[in-house]
Amino acid sequence: MHDLQQEKKLVLEYFNSINNANSDTLIEIISKYTSSNFKMRCTHPFNELSGAEEIANNLWIPIKNSFNPIQRRMDIFYAGINSLDNNEGKWVTSMGHLMGVFKKSFFGIQPNYKSILLRYAEFYKVENNKITEGAIFLDIMNFMQQLGLPVIPESTGLVCVTPGPMNHRGLKYEHSNDAESQKTLELIHRMRDRLVKGSNMKSYKDELTLDWHDDMIWWGPGGIGASYTIDGYVKGHTKPFHDG
């Protein structure tokens, strides 16, 4: 298996530098860690961004201006090889919440001057000790639900701030066991292929039991919400889609 410690170190340094940067230094910080053709795919309204200046001005400065002070609270951190990129692309992933005091308007959403958590998931590709590509997903719907804004119908699952793993071991700073990592990857691929291609099982619930424990927890985004157990997932997540 690949040793991705250097890639993880680079991305952690990038996170820390972004966290400590101000509006005047963000472009310089992003340029230091990224390639000249660095691009980001982001949640709307940020969408696709290219280059340090555009990413600083259109992504991080609006976030840091609206939520101040702000801190990154990571629950998940790991690295891996992208199997969809000829098993060559080295990616580092992080998930958690950006916590801050909501002090200034955020794309038309008015502040409540209270602490708030913005759920995120980030993915960064590293090549030649530079970040060349990234994606960030921000749970804007859950953020609006925390504010009590009735912009969408009631969620079919639990509306909450997503906790980290129950064993609190989601931060993989050190090298992970290769055999366990491979087993996990194979399970995810098996589940993905079954969901896309279907199986010969009589029901969707029976199909899920092939890959999931009964006490599986689905931490869905705002608008869907979280579901506990396979029965809960079918009721709170799958059935509404099938009914629609």
Regions found by a protein language model. Give the residues of each.
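C-terminal and inter-domain tail/linker signature
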Residues: M1-G244
